[in-house]
């Protein structure tokens, strides 16, 4: 809406916004009111300089996880912005999580082995052991540039990963499971 207004194409901007909102809500409805049997637990972030960076339970990302039928490991955290944690805190809260979401800029092919080389303790997480890492490489995907204007596509990616039976034919754009 804002960009349409800014560029003098308010009508087109409003129409585009309405179409995105409609599709997002249709996708969100797939997991609403207990329609999924299991809500997987997901955590996010990585260690950087000895600190684990994630976002709070009131963030856009936490809402996306909820709308995709997943429980974010910090869902009860009242913050909407960045959260700095130590490894032990994350491990205690996310050790048994089903999925781990990682967004980074990795040169080359990111893999479980490359992740383990960053910190061997990563291999102790269940999501690592059971190949539940959700990944976006910003070297190949304009995540922060495009994602804010395509939340319905991000939601579809997450739905496809968390509940593959709901969108079996979806082709991921931003997130896919790490191989």
Predicted features and spans:
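Flexible, glycine-rich surface segments
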Residues: 23, 27-112
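C-terminal soluble interaction/assembly domains
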Residues: 74-76, 80-179
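Extracytoplasmic substrate-binding proteins
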Residues: 1-50, 75, 139-179
């Amino acid at each position: 809406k804002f960009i349409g207004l800014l560029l003098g194409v308010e009508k087109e901007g409003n129409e585009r916004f309405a179409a995105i909102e409609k599709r997002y809500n249709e996708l969100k409805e797939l997991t609403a009111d207990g329609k999924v049997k299991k809500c997987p637990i997901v955590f996010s972030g990585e260690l950087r300089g000895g600190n684990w960076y994630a976002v709070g339970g009131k963030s856009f990302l936490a809402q996306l996880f909820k709308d995709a039928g997943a429980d974010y490991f910090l869902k009860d955290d009242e913050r909407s912005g960045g959260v700095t944690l130590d490894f032990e805190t994350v491990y205690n809260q996310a050790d048994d999580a089903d999925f781990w979401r990682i967004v980074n800029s990795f040169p080359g092919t990111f893999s479980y082995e490359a992740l383990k080389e960053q910190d061997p303790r990563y291999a102790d997480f269940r999501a690592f052991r059971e190949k539940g890492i959700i990944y976006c490489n910003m070297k190949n995907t304009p995540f922060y540039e495009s994602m804010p204007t395509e939340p319905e596509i991000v939601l579809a990616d997450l739905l496809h990963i968390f509940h593959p039976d709901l969108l079996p034919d979806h082709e991921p754009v931003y997130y896919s499971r790490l191989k």
